[in-house]
Amino acid sequence: MVFRALYLMAIVFVVDGHTTLGDMFTLDGLFKYYSFHLMLFAFGAGYFFRMRGSLASDILSRAKRLLLPLYGWNLVYGIGAAVLRRFGGFEIGVPLSAYTLLLAPIVDGEHFVWNLGSWFIFPLFCVQVIYSCIRRAAKIWKDNEIITFIVSLIPGVIAVSLCSAGGDEPMLPLFVMRPLILLPAYAGGMLYKNALEARDSMPTVPYLAIVVILRALLCVRVENLAYLLSNCTYFVCGPFGVYAGAALSIAFFLRIARLLAPHVAKSRLALSISRNTFAIMMHHYMGFFALNCVFLVMNMLGIWAGDFSVRSFRTQAHYNYAPGGHAEFNVLYLIAGLLFPLAVAFVTDRLKVLFRRITKKRPVAAPSSG
């Protein structure tokens, strides 16, 4: 249940980070989302890593679970974006093509905008495959967890160094850099599970105090710990800043998750959010769009939202309406970004059940012996 709470916080950080303010839970900037939130996801996923048979069957299993939904929703959003551009006057997203349908989900992932968060799915798939290969090779060093983590850390350090050297342009393709940068955090999940969790017994108050002090000192030492993993840019903090910052953030929120776990276990909504992180990552921008549609209708009816910008709605992918300039309304986008994907997940789950019932074959009657 601790990791349910951890996933809950991680996905809330992701959605909040995509709103206009994007800093509701950063502790006044001490834990900036873009310095750790995707590492937090990778860490949680790594904690639950397990090999699934042979390497080939392992890859196929992960592709079925991650890539098939990715491509399916990419098609849905591509068609939806085309319809909105053709009939709704929108200027967001790129046209349908073989590239946007087949290659863009893995080399970019931000092309149709309304499913922008889906770029993370292919790197996560690659991380799982790479780490599976490393675990199979770990027999060479007798499955020593420290060595396994170091082997996973080295590619990440190299990738971050290349990002830092490249400035505003990554020196290697995004589909190579993204998973390599995430790999140490994913490996850290298994390191924690197999070597550190049993020793994680320090009392909470001194534990959190030490982590906060170290994080504050790191923030003073490093100019900016935040970076843009989606584009592999703004890595001014270098490998040490990236991974030390991620480790301290994970340590902090892992202990917070332990405190929240009993309460999360009693909340159906919290559990639902933590169990549907794929759907929320995929659809939260559409949740923002749905809320903007509500404001648009209110504006057209003259009920409220008189300063809602229809032009910005149609041309700006990140447009969040602030009624009367009150940015506090940003929380509505956070709520919409969490609840709308849950509704999508609920509907798709019901459709899957219905499809299975329709396609389920009835047992063939045995031939009569007479």
Feature roles, as predicted:
Residues M1-G370:
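Alpha-helical transmembrane segments and their immediate juxtamembrane cytosolic regions
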